[in-house]
Curated annotation (Swiss-Prot):
The keyword rRNA-binding applies. This is Large ribosomal subunit protein uL24. Keywords: Ribonucleoprotein, Ribosomal protein, RNA-binding, rRNA-binding. GO terms for biological process: translation. It comes from Chlorobium phaeobacteroides (strain DSM 266 / SMG 266 / 2430). The keyword Transmembrane does not apply. Belongs to the universal ribosomal protein uL24 family. GO terms for cellular component: ribonucleoprotein complex; ribosome. NCBIfam families: rplX_bact. It holds the Pfam family ribosomal_L24.
Length: 80
């Protein structure tokens, strides 16, 4: 019986240097920090930076807004 989850073989892997070939960050270069083969997405250093609102916790009672990289589709990058 199939589970419905299909792993996509990607042309890039962790620590590869890549160039973004489409999207808002077109032309930017960076190192791949993380790969998600099931979703076909990658996280590239310094690309697709977004703000993330963190809830207040015991360790950080104020809460905060942090900027971090979010995943982009692997078809939007190529090795450099």
């Amino acid at each position: 019986m199939k589970t419905g989850i299909k792993k996509v073989k990607l042309h890039v892997k962790k620590n590869d240097m890549v160039v973004v070939i489409s999207g808002n960050d077109k032309g930017k270069t960076g190192k791949i920090l993380r790969v998600f083969p099931v979703k076909g997405r990658v996280i590239v250093e310094g690309v697709n930076i977004r703000k993330r609102h963190m809830k207040p916790t015991q360790g950080n009672p104020q809460g905060s807004i942090i900027e971090r990289e979010f995943a982009i589709h692997a078809s939007n990058v190529k090795k450099s």
